[in-house]
């Protein structure tokens, strides 16, 4: 599945717009990661546990958006975007969304 952040795909013609696609993941913090993150905020540096967690969540959100597009018969997703929001204390949502199209 071709996924782009632009509204068009160079060299390809969009023949049909199918609709919005989404994929989301709500990820909670692990207590052990949270304790280590607390130390990192005191001493500085990258919080690798959270970086890895968000990277995995972003990949899963994208996979779910692709599955949504495939279920609509799409060849590509254009205008792909990611957003992150806090759902509750200790949990964040990663949302991937875009427009499913046929080429």
UniProtKB/Swiss-Prot annotation:
InterPro entries: UPF0145_dom_sf (IPR035439), UPF0145_YbjQ-like (IPR002765). Disulfide bonds: none annotated. Transmembrane segments: none annotated. Gene3D superfamilies: Hypothetical protein apc22750. Chain B. It comes from the Bacteria. Belongs to the UPF0145 family. This is UPF0145 protein PBPRB0184.
């Amino acid at each position: 599945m071709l996924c782009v952040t632009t509204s068009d795909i160079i060299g390809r013609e969009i023949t049909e717009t199918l609709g919005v696609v989404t994929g989301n993941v709500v990820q909670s913090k692990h207590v052990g990661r949270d304790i280590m993150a607390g130390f990192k905020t005191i001493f500085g540096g990258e919080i690798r546990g959270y970086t890895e967690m968000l990277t995995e969540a972003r990949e899963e959100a994208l996979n779910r958006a692709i599955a949504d597009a495939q279920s609509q018969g799409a060849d590509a997703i254009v205008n792909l975007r990611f957003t992150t929001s806090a759902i509750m204390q200790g949990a964040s949502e990663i949302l991937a969304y875009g427009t499913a199209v046929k080429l």
